[in-house]
Amino acid sequence: MKFLIAFVAIAFFACVSAGGYGNIGLGGYGLGNVGYLQNHGGGYGRRPILISKSSNPSAAAAAAAASSGVNSGLYNQRGVIGYELDGGILGGHGGYGGGLGY
């Protein structure tokens, strides 16, 4: 029970530090971008791997803490390619793929 409480507390503080307007990352409101991809490893017998990484280190820590209780695996980033319509400073505000600002 102590470990569960400690895990929840760590995940909560990681999420709080990843959110809010104080952290400056790429894309919307300074939250950073976290992308997920499920890699099946070329067969049905293998456990799928959840891949995730962020432009913001605290957001990556929050994603790792949150996903470790659900599905363990390797973490890495996959970007979404798109174009920007208005060339906003914090990333695209429209266009194909939504523009993650990378």
Swiss-Prot record:
List localization entries: Secreted
> Could you give one GO CC term from the UniProt record?
extracellular region
Please list which residues make up the signal peptide. 1-18
Which keywords, in A-to-Z order, does the entry hold? Answer: Secreted, Signal
Q: List the disulfide bonds.
A: none
User: Per the record's keyword annotation, is Secreted included, yes or no?
Assistant: yes
Function field: Chorion membrane (egg shell) protein; plays a role in protecting the egg from the environment.
Q: Which family does it belong to?
A: Belongs to the chorion protein S15/S18 family.
The name this protein goes by in its record: Chorion protein S15
* Encoding gene per record: Cp15
